[in-house]
Amino acid sequence: MLSAISKVSTLKSCTRYLTKCNYHASAKLLAVKTFSMPAMSPTMEKGGIVSWKYKVGEPFSAGDVILEVETDKSQIDVEALDDGKLAKILKDEGSKDVDVGEPIAYIADVDDDLATIKLPQEANTANAKSIEIKKPSADSTEATQQHLKKATVTPIKTVDGSQANLEQTLLPSVSLLLAENNISKQKALKEIAPSGSNGRLLKGDVLAYLGKIPQDSVNKVTEFIKKNERLDLSNIKPIQLKPKIAEQAQTKAADKPKITPVEFEEQLVFHAPASIPFDKLSESLNSFMKEAYQFSHGTPLMDTNSKYFDPIFEDLVTLSPREPRFKFSYDLMQIPKANNMQDTYGQEDIFDLLTGSDATASSVRPVEKNLPEKNEYILALNVSVNNKKFNDAEAKAKRFLDYVRELESF
């Protein structure tokens, strides 16, 4: 018995709680939702209805396209935000110049019965807007008229005397303020002086026109913006270097070591068989010099047998590996033979006279047999090093000289 009583008391308390939270066992008669003309762009003010995709009473789901709206630029599909069905269509297909926010249909829930559902009164909603504008009272209308009189009496002075752009789209804050004070757009563009760029009407201009703020404050703000919209560089002067800094810069430039060009000059003496003509010897020497030049440039300075040597890497890190590091020039001359101590005119040598030696005796020299006769030549070599551009030029020039010095062994 006690358990039954406790169950009943618990059930009553739960019922009171559910009733308090507006939970009922019977279906609730829900009011329909007003579907207004959507704004498909920030600048859209009016639009048209191309077609309705659903008829009255046909259910639709969230995301379905319920109608197609026409703007001044294109035609856009409008999707449903929630599940529901059309209870009544206020604007039929083909309607033009429908203001944004104006009711165009009523939407009910999917489970609602359209026969028993109550629709809002249509007498006052035919030309209603989504934004309800409060009717001004008698006191407020008198106050606005007084402000307008004051505004018309006091001349409006703008900073640049510009006129409002008649083709501009008013900002939402400006449109709302004009609607609250029963001022049309055409009247505002004609009578209110703009302070925005390119003749744009701002909220401060409307407030100054209504007398809610002084016109001087608007002019001051406009002057400040126009004064600082461009960077003033007239007061900027170039910094002049102090004489000490200039002297230090000159001394640093003078302290830089100047690279002097390097030149090598050598005279090499070598022998060649007398049977070889001079022209043939010159041709062979020219080939030898070219070979030495190619060897000095082509062979790397680093030890090629080292495990750290890589020809591809050396070719990449070397500055302009194909450009010459030095230039050379040479002159080949034959040294004439001295067969006797007398000159070509039959006179004795001055050194023989001073030493008292017999010229006839000294002129006869033993000639060894089986020795081929050789001519003596002198090679005057000049090497100009391009060390101002390449740091390895001098080393390769010295390698070239070492290669040519091998002629002295002959």
From Swiss-Prot:
Residues 32-108 form the Lipoyl-binding domain. Signal peptide: none annotated. Keywords: Lipoyl, Mitochondrion, Transit peptide. Residues 1-30 form a transit peptide. GO terms for molecular function: dihydrolipoyllysine-residue acetyltransferase activity; structural molecule activity. Its main location: mitochondrion. Required for anchoring dihydrolipoamide dehydrogenase (E3) to the dihydrolipoamide transacetylase (E2) core of the pyruvate dehydrogenase complexes of eukaryotes. This specific binding is essential for a functional PDH complex. This is Pyruvate dehydrogenase complex protein X component, mitochondrial. It comes from Saccharomyces cerevisiae (strain ATCC 204508 / S288c). The gene is PDX1.
